[in-house]
Amino acid sequence: MSNLRAFTHDTSLILRRSLAQARRGPVLAFGFPIVFPLLMIGLFSQIYSRITNVPGFPATSYLAWMAPAAFLMTAMFGSGYSATGLVTDVQTGYLDRLRLIPVSPAAIMLGRLLFDVVRVLIAGLVVLVASVAFGAPFGGGPLDVVGMLIVLALWTLGYTGLFYVVGLTSRSQQKLAVLIPAFLPISLLSSAYIPRSLAPHWVQVAASINPYTHVVDAARHFMSGNAHWSDLAGAVLAGGALIALTQLGAARAFARLLRAD
């Protein structure tokens, strides 16, 4: 078997195992990523609906403004599941058994990352459909949906890398749980909830360097149907930078773990 075929086989093996594990606990695997985003579009958009009366607010409804952020929030709540599973494999010795087969370490990581992307894309589509059902306007077409999914996949790969770095470094599931509230400062210091022009100056500065701002803005343009490919380019640059930072850290942490064992 060629190296490429072996790598593809190993990656597929890990992906199928991850899917099988998720089917045994579908609520945590597929339900958890959509709970808070659905709360955002179903409750928060109603509570803060009058914010559109503020002069300069650029959307016709708060739901229209918040829906793209809720769509991308699925990645922030979907991340950590596979990283927790990998830490469990380390603790139980299953990772050692995989290495004896042998399964490529890169395939182990890639298979789990692909599973994370699949889970989050499904969750994102559910939230997008729910947003439109609740009344969020969607002015785009099929290509705009594809653009939104690309942005979501990039954000998922970048954000989930944080969990792999912490999990593989600490080998502790409890340490991973500490990262869950990280979505709060990241989303608050962005354009997710209010336009940057209406925020205090220091928040505007923080939002301008926050990659979440750029992916949310891109998703917002795609959802409105007014997107240009430059919007996707900005999201790719922001998401790509985060991916390079976190996934490189995850790869180095995984390599150190394998050497230590």
Language-model region placement:
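Aromatic- and glycine-rich beta-strand/loop motifs that create alpha-glucan
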Residues: 1-36
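Short, membrane-interfacial amphipathic segments enriched in basic
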Residues: 1-13, 159, 202-213
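Hydrophobic alpha-helical transmembrane segments of multi-pass membrane transport proteins
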Residues: 39-46, 62-134, 163, 179-182, ...
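Short helix-capping/hinge motifs at transmembrane helix termini and TM-loop junctions
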Residues: 44-53, 77, 131-143, 167-172, ...
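Transmembrane helix segments
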Residues: 48-49, 167-209, 213
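Alpha-helical transmembrane segments and their short interhelical loops
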Residues: 105-181, 227-251
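Membrane-interfacial helix-loop-helix junctions in multi-pass membrane proteins
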Residues: 139, 190-244
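Short cytosolic juxtamembrane segments of multi-pass membrane proteins
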Residues: 254-261
